[in-house]
Structures are given as structure tokens and as C-alpha cells.
């Protein structure tokens, strides 16, 4: 039990969240329409500190390398009631950093922008 609490404490103090410029634009646009979105994103961050790649059916690892994992997750948004947003993020295990890549409402867009993910990986793996 002590080791779990210690690990959580270390992750809380070491973890860092950042966003791609495209993500910031999407967040700004969607936050105007869905007022609870920023608060919901903070809840996701608290969850990711405990379990960086998530658990259960709401988290799908789409790219898994030793240094970086790309994860697609369902974000419950209070403003949407029974529906949800999708968040694509990169988790850098060596640095304990999270980079938000994409945010979209499943009702507006069917799938993630794979070109953006590929570009992110190209720029950050080499």
C-alpha cells in the first residue's frame, strides 16, 4: 500500500501536461459550446496521474513504443449528458509527460486525425 501511495505522490509531482497548438484551438472552440469541458479535462488529468495509459474499455492504446504511447480515450463531459468527447494524447514514460494531441466530439467527427498523430510521432521519436 505504501509503495502505491509513494508512486502516486511521485507522479503527481513529476507529471507534466502540455498541448499541441491544434488541440488548444479545438479546446477553445469546444469550451464555448460545452461549458464543463475544461473541468472535465482536469478530472481526466487526475485520473491519468494515477494510471497514465488508463484502464478499461474507455482507453485504447493506438501506438505502443518503449518511449511513447498514443492513447485514445473517451472523456465524459457533463455538458453532453450521456455522450462523450474523444481525447488523443501521448504519454512519454521516460519523462512522465502527457501531450494532448486531439480533442473532438464523436457526433461531429467519426475518427481521429491519423495524419496529425503520425506527424507528432515523426517529430518526437527521432
Predicted regions and their residues:
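Basic, Lys/Arg-enriched alpha-helical interface segments
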Residues: 1-81, 94-96, 106-126
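Short, surface-exposed coil-to-beta transition loops
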Residues: 82-87
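Short, well-structured beta-strand
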Residues: 89-92, 99
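Conserved beta-strand segments of the P-loop GTPase G domain that flank and frequently precede/overlap
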Residues: 101-104
Amino acid at each position: 500500500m505504501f509503495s502505491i501511495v509513494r508512486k502516486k505522490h511521485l507522479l503527481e509531482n513529476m507529471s507534466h501536461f502540455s498541448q499541441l497548438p491544434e488541440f488548444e484551438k479545438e479546446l477553445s472552440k469546444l469550451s464555448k459550446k460545452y461549458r464543463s469541458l475544461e473541468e472535465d479535462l482536469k478530472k481526466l488529468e487526475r485520473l491519468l496521474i494515477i494510471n497514465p495509459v488508463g484502464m478499461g474499455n474507455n482507453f485504447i492504446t493506438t501506438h505502443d513504443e518503449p518511449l511513447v504511447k498514443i492513447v485514445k480515450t473517451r472523456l465524459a463531459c457533463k455538458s453532453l449528458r450521456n455522450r462523450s468527447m474523444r481525447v488523443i494524447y501521448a504519454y512519454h514514460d521516460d519523462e512522465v509527460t502527457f501531450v494532448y494531441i486531439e480533442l473532438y466530439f464523436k457526433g461531429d467527427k467519426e475518427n481521429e486525425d491519423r495524419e496529425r498523430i503520425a506527424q507528432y510521432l515523426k517529430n518526437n521519436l527521432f
